[in-house]
Regions:
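Short histidine-centered beta-strand/loop micro-motifs
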Residues: 63-69, 86-91, 108, 117-119, ...
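Glycine- and acidic-residue-biased ligand/ion/polar-headgroup-sensing regions
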Residues: 82, 93-105, 109-111
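A short, N-terminal "cap"/entry segment at the start of jelly-roll beta-barrel domains
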Residues: 1-72, 165-174
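Double-stranded beta-helix
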Residues: 2-11, 15, 110-113, 134-174
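His/acidic/aromatic-lined binding-pocket segments of jelly-roll/cupin-type domains
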Residues: 77-78, 88-90, 94-99, 119, ...
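Histidine-centered metal-chelating micro-motifs
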Residues: 84-87, 105, 125-127, 131-136
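Conserved short histidine dyad/triad with adjacent acidic residue
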Residues: 56-63, 74-91, 131
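Short acidic-glycine-tyrosine-enriched beta hairpin
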Residues: 111-131
Length: 174
């Protein structure tokens, strides 16, 4: 006989394993790319697609009925064409980028001066961006990049853009 050594959350106490498999499995082929997941994604140079698996990530789209509800973290896959990236920003929680395919140039930006430090990541390499540290990325390669993004909270705030105008309208895409 199988014995669970940890208790299920109250809302899953009477859920069958068949129901669990339906509720907690998400397949890439079933996910529509969201090219308007972020306010800055409307701007040339920042265009990218988010594929949401667990929670809404930094998009603020936490009510997406097609995703697995985020608990302690979110998980998305980003698709970024060459020459595109995202605007410098912060989060209130840790953010991780884990490259699956292609190459991604990530940066940390010094608050006040705008000075940046860049590192290029390839497949199976990652960066962990601490809360409150200005960061971002660009695909400066010749091929598209796919990478995993995790945020350390089930419903994180919308991205905190370093640019004042973007920050003022950071929820404009919702």
């Amino acid at each position: 006989m199988t014995t669970a050594r940890h208790q299920r959350p109250a809302e899953l106490q009477d859920t069958s394993i068949d129901e669990l498999a339906e509720k907690f499995v998400r397949r890439f082929g079933d996910i529509d790319a969201d090219w308007e997941a972020f306010e800055d994604a409307k701007i040339d140079g920042y265009r990218r697609a988010q594929h949401r698996f667990i929670g809404g990530g930094g998009s603020g789209k936490h009510d997406d009925p097609n995703v697995i509800k985020g608990g302690a973290f979110t998980l998305s896959i980003m698709f970024v064409n060459p020459g595109e990236g995202n605007a410098a920003h912060t989060h209130e929680v840790e953010e991780v980028f884990f490259v699956l395919k292609g190459h991604l140039k990530v940066f940390f930006e010094e608050e006040g001066t705008g000075r940046q430090i860049h590192r290029t990541l390839g497949p199976w390499e990652c960066v962990s961006c601490p809360p409150g540290v200005v960061h971002g990325y660009i695909n400066d390669s010749l091929e598209p990049v796919y990478f995993q993004v995790m945020l350390g909270k089930g419903k994180p705030e919308t991205m905190g853009y370093a640019d004042e105008k973007l920050f003022e309208n950071r929820d404009g895409h919702l």
